[in-house]
Design a protein with these regions (language model features):
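Conserved C-terminal structural/oligomerization subdomain of aldehyde/semialdehyde dehydrogenase
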Residues: 30-36, 220, 257, 311, ...
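Residue-level signal for inorganic ion chemistry
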Residues: 31, 67, 89, 111, ...
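Glycine-rich loop-to-alpha-helix module at the N-terminal edge of alpha/beta enzyme cores
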Residues: 32-121, 131
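Structural signal for hydrophobic packing residues in well-ordered secondary-structure cores
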Residues: 56, 60, 75-82, 86, ...
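Rossmann-like NAD(P) dinucleotide-binding subdomain of oxidoreductase/dehydrogenase enzymes
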Residues: 123-266, 318, 394
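ALDH superfamily catalytic-core signature
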Residues: 230-374, 437
Length: 481
């Protein structure tokens, strides 16, 4: 493991928790403990909130050009240290090194985009009566609490912190307890770049204790969370008393529809790329694959052949797919597959844990294709978060849309067709915050990312993401003698 901090960072200082407790960070590829991380409780979290609150006035009024310059310096350092940051990420999370490096570089781009977009947070002057000016200003909110997940331990940190900092807010970050090292490495870069003390603080520890301390605090004016719908609902309820501004990016169960006129090669290649990125541990991963009856056999044959070419192993090696994050992830997939096969589904390839040699040391699972999936099976409605492609046959366009929308979630969706009229109809009909039409790249620094229904609300990325971290103030000015 490259050298990286393992302590809390509060008010510009690296510090142990009050109780001196630590938590082991385990490499999911081999079960080895790679670091021991300091743990915080309510007291340390309150100190971090206090530091952020005290740092806010000076940070908010810093000359915009200076703040922009500082954020570009952070991006420069992330790019300069990309290989080291990528190795840290792969060791703690498991994903292949090339995916980790891509995540780091996207993180740097998040800072660049947010820095430049901060120059374009335009206010407004509204036509007013004579001798008046109706002025609308956009101002930072204050202290932002950010809680990030383990599946993108660097990307989710930069996606939240870049716009929050760019718009003049201060931060208390609580990263995932499974993968805090990437966040800590980013905070080392903050320190090296010269971010003023107290502007960004990081605490690791009990999700329940830290979460409750953040939501209970009136000094925290904004909460941003990426994670499960269940936890998001809890945080939403806990934040009600203090009336925080909130954005939640929660569960997803993305449909992927292949119509009979689709470019099959593109659909197969994109499906495999999207499904097995990060071993399927992605909120926008295709989870229900709807294939037109007319092309089902041809599509399935090409898909299985492609999946069987995937190489699974330690992310530091030349592989396509790494390990799952924890043992319980394997248990969940096994349970879903048993439920499905008991009810008539058929495993075409894969379908179990990878064993033997180095596989026995880690949380490895065979890339799996499951056919004959129906609504009677748990996998139709439950997010898998693993390397399983469930195939579902449809006969009509309306049937495909209806089945795709038959979910409590509404984050990402995908469909493949050459028919422009169908693109318009299906794109409008899908009840999802994001739609990929003949494309899987739905997350970009410039474009809004977020969902509807039980996938949460609020947007990240693009100018919509910047707006999540500002508040609007109206000034009615009357000119008097």
């Amino acid at each position: 493991l490259p050298k990286v901090q393992t302590k809390l960072f509060i008010n510009g200082k690296w510090t142990d928790g009050d109780n001196k407790e630590t938590k082991d960070i385990v490499n999911p590829a081999n079960g080895e403990v790679i670091a021991k991380i300091a743990q915080a409780g309510p007291n340390e979290t309150k100190k971090a909130i206090k530091a952020a609150k005290e740092a806010f006035p000076d940070w908010a009024k810093m000359e915009l050009a200076d703040r922009v310059k500082l954020l570009h310096k952070i991006a420069d350092l992330m790019e300069e240290k990309a290989d080291t940051l990528a190795k840290i990420m792969t060791l703690e999370q498991g994903k292949p090194l090339k995916e980790s490096k891509g995540e780091v570089l996207t993180g740097a781009e998040n800072f660049r985009f947010a820095a430049e977009e901060a120059r374009r947070l335009y206010g407004e002057t509204i036509p007013a009566p004579n001798n008046h000016a109706f002025i609308v200003k956009k101002q930072p909110i204050g202290v932002v609490a950010a809680i990030t997940p383990w599946n993108f331990p660097g990307g989710m940190v930069t996606r939240k912190l870049a716009p929050a900092l760019a718009t003049g807010n201060t931060i208390v970050l609580k990263p995932s307890g499974d993968t805090p090292l990437s966040a800590l490495a980013i905070f080392e870069i903050f320190e090296e770049a010269g971010l003023p003390k107290g502007v960004a603080n990081i605490v690791m520890g009990s999700s329940k204790e830290i979460g409750e301390t953040l939501t209970d605090s009136d000094d925290v004016r904004k909460l941003t969370f990426t994670g499960s719908t269940k936890v998001g609902q809890t945080l939403f309820k806990q934040s009600a008393e203090t009336l925080k501004k909130i954005s939640l990016e929660l569960g997803g169960h993305a449909p992927f529809i292949v119509f009979d006129d689709a470019n099959l090669d593109a659909a197969v290649n994109d499906l495999v790329a999207a499904k097995f990125r990060n071993n399927g541990q992605v909120c926008v991963s295709p989870n229900r694959i709807f294939v037109a009856k007319e092309i089902k056999e041809k599509f399935t044959k090409a898909l299985v052949a492609k999946v069987e070419q995937l190489k699974v192993g330690n992310g530091l090696d030349d592989v396509n797919v790494g390990p799952l994050i924890r043992e319980d992830a394997i248990d969940k997939i096994d349970k879903q597959l048993k439920n499905a096969t008991d009810k008539g589904a058929k495993v075409l390839t894969g379908g179990g844990r990878l064993t033997g040699s180095d596989y026995d040391k880690g949380n490895f699972y065979k890339p799996t294709v499951l056919d004959n999936v129906t609504r009677e099976m748990d996998i139709f409605y439950e997010e898998t978060f693993g390397p399983v492609i469930p195939l579902i046959t449809f006969e009509t366009e309306d049937e495909a849309i209806e089945m795709a929308n038959d979910s409590e979630f509404g984050l990402a969706s995908y469909f493949y067709t050459k028919d422009l009229a169908r693109v318009e109809k299906v794109g409008a009909a899908l009840e999802y915050g994001m739609v990929g039409a003949n494309e899987i790249a739905i997350s970009n620094p410039e474009t809004p990312f977020g969902g509807v229904k039980h996938s949460g609300f609020g947007r990240e990325n693009g100018h919509y993401g910047m707006e999540e971290y500002i508040q609007v103030k109206f000034i009615n000015l009357k000119y008097r003698d």
